[in-house]
Curated annotation (Swiss-Prot):
InterPro entries: Cell_cycle_GpsB, DivIVA_domain, DivIVA_fam
Primary location: cytoplasm
Function in brief: Divisome component that associates with the complex late in its assembly, after the Z-ring is formed, and is dependent on DivIC and PBP2B for its recruitment to the divisome. Together with EzrA, is a key component of the system that regulates PBP1 localization during cell cycle progression. Its main role could be the removal of PBP1 from the cell pole after pole maturation is completed. Also contributes to the recruitment of PBP1 to the division complex. Not essential for septum formation.
The protein's name in its UniProt record: Cell cycle protein GpsB
Gene Ontology BP terms: cell division; peptidoglycan-based cell wall biogenesis; regulation of cell shape
GO cellular component terms attached to this protein's record: cytoplasm
UniProt xrefs under NCBIfam families: DivI1A_domain, PRK14127.1
Coiled coil: 42-77
Protein location: Cytoplasm
Superkingdom of this protein's organism: Bacteria
Family from the record: Belongs to the GpsB family.
Subunit structure of this chain's protein: Forms polymers through the coiled coil domains. Interacts with PBP1, MreC and EzrA.
Lineage: Bacteria, Bacillati, Bacillota, Bacilli, Bacillales
Gene: gpsB
């Protein structure tokens, strides 16, 4: 991610005072209104940046959970149907695998938005 550090904060903009001169300058109300807009934009940007960080952390967590679930599915998958002694055990394992695969699918949708 590129460096998004800002030179000014909303507080810096709000507290900025311009030197007053006797010569004709800009209308104070117009400058204040413009600075208010800039402050609002800076605050929105800071809020959006915080949201991006939060979503990035959540995305990382979900990817890790997805990988763990894939590993569990891979290790719990039966190598051969003969290794199970009863149909009940096979049915329970198959049902459990289907549940895990559904969860993986839901996590993929949440992480990748598909």
């Amino acid at each position: 991610m590129s460096d998004v550090s800002l030179k000014l904060s909303a507080k810096d903009i709000y507290e900025k005072d311009f030197e007053k001169t006797m010569a004709r300058g800009y209308r104070r109300e117009e400058v204040d209104a413009f600075l208010d807009d800039i402050i609002a934009d800076y605050q929105k940007m800071a809020d959006m940046n915080n949201e991006v960080v939060k979503l990035s952390e959540e995305n990382h967590k979900l990817k890790k959970e997805l990988e763990e679930l894939r590993l569990r599915v891979a290790t719990s998958r039966p190598q051969d149907n003969k290794s199970f002694s009863s149909n009940n055990t096979t049915t329970n394992t198959s049902s459990n695998n289907v549940d895990i695969l559904k969860r993986i699918s839901n996590l993929e949708k949440a992480v990748f938005g598909k």
